[in-house]
Amino acid sequence: MNASSEDPSAGFKWPVSVERPIAAPAIEVWNAISRPGNLELCHPFCERNPVIAWPGPESRDEVHYLSGWMYERRFRQWIDGTGYDLEIGRKNGSTSFVSWRITPIDTRACTLRITVCPHALQDIPVAIRWIPYTLRLRPLLRDYLESVVKGFEWYVVRGEAVPRNAFGTHPWFSGR
C-alpha cells in the first residue's frame, strides 16, 4: 500500500480506540510521538525500538516487546504536529492499521488518541466474530492501548522513561 489518499483502514471492522487527556501542550506530545525510537522511552511493554527510516510517511521501525514478539511498523501518513497512520504486524505477515492523533484542548493540554483496526478476526464471519471480539480481543486491546497512552503521558509530564509494565502486565506483550 502506498501513502496516497487511499483509506488504509478500509475493509477493517470494529476498530478499538483509546483517548486520554494529557496535561501538556500538544507540541510536547508531538515531540514525544515523533521522536525516533520513542517507544523505548514511552511504551511500557517495549524492550527495544530500532529505527530503520525516520521521519515522515516512509518511516519504518521495529517494536521488540518484553514478551519476545517483534512487530514492524510501516508509516503511511505523517501529519506534522497532529499524528500519523501506520501499519503494524509481524514481518511479511498480516498488518493492523493504527492511527495516532493529538487534539489540543488549550495551550497547556491536549488529548492523545490511538485507534487500532486489528487484522485478527477480519476473515471470520461477523455472526461468529463478535463473540471473541467482545470477550477477548477488544478488552485486551483496550487495556494495551490504555497502558501505551499512559506511558506517553508519563514521559511527557514527568520527563522520564516509563518503567516496564508500569500499569500492569499484559498477556500478549509483557515478559514471560
Go through each PLM region and give its residues.
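Short beta-strand segments that buttress and anchor functional surface loops
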Residues: D7, S59-L66, D85-K91
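Beta-strand/loop substructures that line and gate deep hydrophobic ligand-binding cavities in soluble
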Residues: R90-S147, W154, P163-N165
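Hydrophobic ligand-binding cavity/cleft-lining segments
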Residues: M1-W54, W172-R176
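Hydrophobic pocket/interface hotspot
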Residues: V29-I33, L39, D61, F75, ...
